[in-house]
Amino acid sequence: MATVKVIDFIQTPFDFLIVGGGTAGLVLAARLSEEPGIQVGVIEAGSLRLGDPKVDLPTGPGQMLGDPGYDWNFESIPQAGANAKAYHIPRGRMLGGSSGINFMSYNRPSAEDIDDWANKLGVKGWTWSELLPYFKRSENLEPIEPSASCPVSPKVHGTGGPIHTSIGPWQAPIEESLLAAFDEAARLQRPAEPYSGAHLGFYRSLFTLDRTSTPVRSYAVSGYYAPVMGRPNLKVLENAQVCRILLSDASDGIPVAEGVELHHAGARYAVSARREVILSAGSVQSPQLLELSGIGDPSVLEGAGIACRVANTDVGSNLQEHTMSAVSYECADGIMSVDSLFKDPALLEEHQSLYAKNHSGALSGSVSLMGFTPYSSLSTETQVDATMARIFDAPSVSGRLSQQNASYQRRQQEAVAARMQNRWSADIQFIGTPAYFNTAAGYASCAKIMSGPPVGYSACYSIVVSNMYPLSRGSVHVRTSNPMDAPAIDPGFLSHPVDVDVLAAGIVFADRVFRSTLLNGKVRRRVSPPAGLDLSNMDEARQFVRNHIVPYHHALGTCAMGQVVDEKLRVKGVRRLRVVDASVMPMQVSAAIMATVYAIAERASDIIKKDCGFGRRLRAHI
C-alpha cells in the first residue's frame, strides 16, 4: 500500500524489513511482495516524491544536488591525493534513492568486469552470463531510431521491465562531428552492441528516460514502487531513519537479526522481522549501520564507543569510486550548447516552449555521447611499463592496504594490471557534455558542475574523462555511536599514482579530439585546462588532474562480496541479515553503476525467494 503512519508500521508482523527504499530496496520490495502471504516493510529516511518535477524532468539534478530534501549532502574528509580538498558526496534522500537524483545514464559494464568477481576474487555464482538475465528483466527498452548511433540487439535487452531506457530526444549540433573525431583519434570501431558486455569505442548512450509521452525520469519509484503501491502486504514508512539492527544470540552464540530500531518524528521505535532484515542503505550507510550494530573492525567500534558483536575488519573498507576530470572548449559562433541557454534569455524561452509543446529541445535531455578506450592505446610503451611498475609498489597506498585483507587487495591489483595491458579493455570513459564542466567549483557543490560558462566566454562543450578501474581505496566508518552523526567518508581519491596517470592520459586524448580538423569552425579555444598549460608535458597534465577532479557518484565495495557478505549476500557471522546494494560489489566496473545495482537487486530477490522456499515464481520472471 501507499506510505503508512508509524504506528501502523511498527504493529505489522513483517517477514522482511528492507532498510532503505532506494535503487535496490524498491526492487526487493516489489519482487518479495509478489508473494501475497509475505509481509514486506520498507523504511526510508526521505520522502515519496512521485510526480515531483525536480525528480521527473531531465534538467532536475542540478536543482536537487545539495538540497537536504533530496540529498544526504555528505562531505568527505580532506583528500590528501587531491590537494586536501573535502568533496561533496551526494546520495539520494528520497524513495528511489540515487536513482531519483542522478543524471540517468544507463550503462552496462564489460563482461570481464563481472566475470572477474568470480574468476579473480572467488565470488562464485556472479558472472556476466548469470547476471545478464537480470539486466534484461529490469529494462524496458523503447524503440531506437536507426540513425541514433546506438546499435541495439533484442538478445541483450529487455522490453517489458520496470525501468524505461531510451535515447534522449536532443543532441548538441556539434556531436556528429565530435563522434567522428573520437573515432579518428582513437582508431577504434564503434561497438556492435555496447550493452552486450563489449562497449569499446564511441556511441550515443541510453538513459533511463521514459519517452512514452512527456520525457520523464524512469527510476525505482516510477518503475518498481508505483505499480505495486496498492499491495496490502507492502508497507513503506517514510521520513524514518534506522538507528541499528536489533541482534539476539542463538544457542550457538551466533547473533540473529531480529529487527531494527528506528527514529521517526523525534521518537524511537523497534520493529521486528520474522524472516530477514535486508540493508539497502547504500555504500555509505549500509556499512555505517553494520558498525552501529556492533559488526565491524573492533578498533573502529572501540573508538566510537560501540561494543563489538561480530569482528570483521573489512566492514566499511574497500571503498572505490570513479573520479572525473574534463577538457572544455569554447564553441565557435553559431554552435549551440546547453550553456547557450545561460547566455541568451530568448533562446532559453524558445527551448522552454519546445519542451512544453512537443517535449523536444535542449531541456529534454542533454548528455548523449560517450565511449571507452584502453589505457594502453593512449600511452607510449614506456609510459605503460612505468605505470605497470607502480601498480604493485605505491607507497601512497600502503597505509590503506595495511588495514585490509592483503591477499584480496593483491588480487584486485592483478585484475587491474591485466586490464590495463589489454588493448581491448575499457579503462577510460569519455562523456560528451554540451556545457562547461566546472570541476573547480563542483568538488564542493555538485550542483555547480554545470552552471554556465566562465566570465568572458561564450557557450562551451566539454569532454569528461573518468578512470574506470581505480586502484585508490578508501573507507566509510562511524565516528560516534550516534546514528544521526554522519560517518567519516574517506574515498581515498588519487591516493594511488596510477589513477593520476590514467586520468592524465585521458585529458591529453580529449584535447587531441578537440583539435581534430573535423572540428574546425566548430570550436574556438580551450577554456580548461588553461591555454598556458602544456599538455605535452605529462607532469603538467598530472598536476592539473590532482587539482581538477570530482566524484562520479559510483561508490561501492564497502560491504563487499567475499569479505563482508557471502555469495548469497548474507552478512558473515550473523543470521537473517543481508546487504543488497552497491556496497556488495567487490570491484569497480566500467560503467555508471545504476543498471548493475538494479540487476544485483533483481537477482538477490530470486536468491532470497529460493532460500525461503518461494521458488515457484522464479522462472516466470527470467
Swiss-Prot record:
Superkingdom is Eukaryota
**Catalytic EC class:** oxidoreductase
The pathway this protein participates in, as annotated, is: Mycotoxin biosynthesis
Q: Which GO terms describe its biological process?
A: secondary metabolite biosynthetic process
Cell membrane: present as a keyword of the record? no
Which is one Pfam family of this protein?
A: GMC_oxred_N
Binding-site residues for FAD, renumbered to this chain: 23-24, 44-45, 102-105, 582, 593-594
Disruption outcome: Leads to complete absence of citrinin production.
Gene3D superfamilies (UniProt xref): FAD/NAD(P)-binding domain, Glucose Oxidase, domain 3
Active site annotation, chain numbering:
554 (proton acceptor)
This entry's Gene Ontology molecular function terms read:
flavin adenine dinucleotide binding; oxidoreductase activity, acting on CH-OH group of donors
Q: Which cofactors are named for this entry?
A: FAD
Q: What is its EC number?
A: 1.1.-.-
Going by the UniProt record, its keywords in alphabetical order are: FAD, Flavoprotein, Oxidoreductase
Alphabetized PROSITE patterns for the sequence: GMC_OXRED_1, GMC_OXRED_2
- Summarize subunit and interaction data from the UniProt record for this chain: Homodimer.
**Described function:** Non-reducing polyketide synthase; part of the gene cluster that mediates the biosynthesis of the mycotoxin citrinin, a hepato-nephrotoxic compound to humans due to inhibition of respiration complex III. The pathway begins with the synthesis of a keto-aldehyde intermediate by the citrinin PKS (pksCT also named citS) from successive condensations of 4 malonyl-CoA units, presumably with a simple acetyl-CoA starter unit. Release of the keto-aldehyde intermediate is consistent with the presence of the C-terminal reductive release domain.
**Similarity-based family:** Belongs to the GMC oxidoreductase family.
Q: What is this protein called?
A: Dehydrogenase citC
Provide the gene name from the record: citC
